Amino acid sequence: MRDLDLSYNRIGDAGAAALAETVAANAHVESLNLRGNDVGPEGCAKIADVLARATRVISVSPPHGETDDRKENDEPANAVSPSRAGTGLRFLDLAHNPLTDDGGAALADALRLNATLTHLDLERTSLGLRALSALCGAVNESNDTLEYLSLENPFQFSVADEHAWPAARMLGANVCLKTFKCGKWGLKHEALETIVAYGLCENKTLETLDMRCNRVDELGGAHVARALRENKTLRRLNLEENKLGDAGAVAVAEALGETTCLMQLDLRCNGIRERGLVALADGVRAMLENDAPPSELRLWGNDFGPPGSKAATAWRDVFKRADSLGVTVKADITFRVVDGQVHVARMTEIGTKEVGNRF
């Protein structure tokens, strides 16, 4: 058995401790899903202890002048590999459990030693500033295996946005992380500036950044634009339910034609109206003409205006242009012409199912 899915089973600390020992004793278990249970800091500490046992074994070269008796197929000197005594756990989902700061800190300590885990989901686990800083610090300073980290919806964050600094340092230094989720962190445009300047502009590996449901306003658009221009690996950016408005959207739009890697962009519910939506349509058109088209766009929840508006017509024409180029761009909006006017409708299953017309 490689995958253990025990999500939503009312498992508490005692059950988590027993499962931790089971995982420790069975090196074949690679995935443990405990989402939506009642695991607290004590149970989390047991799981962290098991993760910490899967440390790195560093082979030391023989002293100068001595011979190396390793055979041809043995690992080279100074090789680094997971300890055979530890777990082989690669995927851990503890989302929606009351881990608190103590549980998060225990996991941070484990990440400094662990050599197997690639996916860690800690969404809505009652983490506070101490745990957020500890986890980002561990990934920044001591971990080079983790590829996916979700710290969405913490219990506590700072009004002054100082929790953005550990995240920025982590992104700027880490060379393995591909997905980072920091939705519902209460981040404003000052925090985004920090994350972009000290994190994304230095990062060479991140492919997905999820910052949904934060407080990034119109001033944040310039920082998003800088990230799109300077980062060369970011493929998916989620800014759903922020406050970019028209000015922020225009800044983002101006950078779209300069990015060569962005594939998915989510700007739903950002208070964008006609001016911003028309600018974004022009930006996506530039991506098409530069042979760097997006694969997925989400825009519903912004104000396209009445039927026949410039925004509705501009976006209809952009998708027509994509079709003429043989490019498939999935979106959460579609268009119908009624009485000579372009109407915008929502797609519930993106790109497949129309469900109505708000405008």
Where are these regions (language model features)?
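Leucine-rich tandem repeat or coiled-coil scaffolds
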Residues: 1-359
